[in-house]
Regions:
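Predominantly a Rossmann-like dinucleotide-binding segment in NAD(P)-dependent oxidoreductases
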Residues: 6-76
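N-terminal Rossmann-like NAD(P) cofactor-binding subdomain of oxidoreductases
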Residues: 1-3
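Alpha-helix boundary/capping detector
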Residues: 38-42, 82-83, 94-96, 145
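Contiguous beta-strand/loop segments that form the cofactor/metal-binding neighborhood of enzyme cores
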Residues: 64-137
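C-terminal helical cap and adjacent loop that interface with cofactors, partners, or active-site loops
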Residues: 134, 144-148
Length: 148
């Protein structure tokens, strides 16, 4: 995983204290797979093969998990709820419980949405308008004032 070595990941670490007490973390990485239609037609491309570490959590969600665990450490508890097709998760939500806050990871290969990560705190939030592995476009939004 290269997420933690991206220049903006270091910026995230610097900005983190400014949000105050962290209350919620959201990471979303949803990308309609070019192989999903073949999967629906009965084929088993590697990205949808559990023997090849396929599926939404292992292929895309791992970047969300690396991003969150890299910033906050191992959660106290984690629960994964997946949309399953033919014994593989095509999309899913991983909820991680930390002392005092929750982190949610959304990963999907069967639908698409803008990628983003948000760290919400008592004094504002950090918004990253990119996939967690890219760490692009990091801004801080204080509760009162302009984005930085």
């Amino acid at each position: 995983m290269t997420t933690q070595y991206q220049p903006n990941y270091a910026k995230l670490r610097e900005l983190l204290p400014r949000v105050g007490t962290v209350r919620m973390v959201q990471c979303s990485f949803s990308q309609y797979s070019s192989r999903y239609d073949a999967f629906c037609a009965g084929q088993t491309p590697p990205v949808f093969d559990p023997l090849c570490a396929g599926g939404a959590l292992m292929d895309l969600g791992v970047y969300n998990v690396s991003y969150i665990v890299g910033l906050f450490g191992e959660p106290n508890k984690a629960v994964y709820a997946a949309n399953m097709e033919r014994n593989i998760d095509t999309s899913g939500v991983l909820m991680m419980d930390y002392s005092g806050f929750k982190a949610v990871s959304l990963a999907a290969k069967d639908c698409a949405a803008p990628a983003r990560c948000i760290i919400q705190g008592t004094k504002g939030y950090i918004l990253q308008k990119s996939t967690p592995n890219y760490c692009g476009g990091v801004t801080f939004h204080p509760n009162e004032g302009k984005e930085e």
